[in-house]
Amino acid sequence: MGAQKSIHAGRAKIDVNVDFTHKLCTSLMFPAFRDTSSPLSLVIGSLCIKHPNLFGGSEKLDVSWDKGLYDSNVLVAFRRPRPEWRPQQCFFIQHSLSPEIGVHGTPVDNFSRSGSGGVNLSKLALGLDLSEPASSKWSSTTSIKFEHVRPINDDGRAITRDLDGFPITCSGNTHDSMVVLKQESRFAKATDQGLSHFSMQIEQGIPVVSKWLIFNRFKFVASKGVRFGPAFLLASLTGGSIVGDMAPYQAFAIGGLGSVRGYGEGAVGSGRSCLVANTELALPLNKMTEGTIFLDCGTDLGSSRLVPGNPSMRQGKPGFGYGFGYGLRFKSPLGHLQVDYAINAFNQKTLYFGVTNLASST
């Protein structure tokens, strides 16, 4: 369900890629944000245009556009060639619009799904990424960006308060602005016996203007995989915290795929801090099929009361939750099919379905 075309413009070749499957398959794994009768309402079409030699000096221009029924994302990135021993530069400008579900969404069906809270975020960002040359198994990226965040309701009108009358922005105005300096370091190692992965992100809000947000936020992800004969055990720990100025939408949202399965997005809680642990054991059933059992748990470490307006408490989120279950992974030349069956702490059952890596036609 994709198409790719190369167009020759002078000496340059422009690659155009249209994809209706990647986002679609991701969205099928999530319950609908709003009252929709089919997960197909979350289909997102992707258009990507790449120019590998914009000014004749190997400058690269990438333009991507993702558009769905409720959200959209436009990204323009420009890269200049530099010696391999110097940091690689990428100038970017990005605009996105999406429902804010993790913090302002309302949990339903024993916290297994999250409905719309009537808050959407329109974000405009522009900045510079500097990727350091990889050293051994370590790599790092430094970026600085200006970000403008404007909350809007489902009708597209700017808002300053949520449905309960509490402020959405940190400034109290219809928007928040900030300059953010970000440093990310990554370690990755893979062998026949297993894998190790660690990443650390640190973000610092810079006080360029007095009303702009000043904060420090960090997040880490540590994963370890070990092979026991045909079985493979993967465990990961994710955590983070934020201090300083903060808008509610900046809180860590706990719950959902990639967090605690069996819960809706952010249905476990949302706080200034978080800690999430995931464990999954995979066993091959045959050449094409793999079975898994998993256990997820997460907590806001009692920090939800420190989020302005305490949206987690107002929505009755527990602040701690766990989910367990089993799943199947099917591999084929056309793509990978994933099915997960999860049960949360309230004995509510949720079925996740997804397809990835579909073959594209040219």
Swiss-Prot record:
GO molecular function: channel activity
One of the record's GO cellular component terms: chloroplast
Localization: Plastid, Chloroplast outer membrane
Family the UniProt entry places it in: Belongs to the OEP80 (TC 1.B.33.2) family.
Tissue specificity: Expressed in germinating seeds. Expressed in the vasculature of roots, cotyledons and leaves.
Disulfide bonds: none
Main location: plastid
InterPro entries: Bac_surfAg_D15, D15-like
Function: Beta-barrel pore-forming protein which possesses voltage-dependent channel activity. Required for proper plastid development. Involved in the maintenance of metabolic homeostasis of full-grown plants.
Keyword Chloroplast: yes
Official protein name in the record: Outer envelope protein 39, chloroplastic
Pfam families named in the record: Omp85
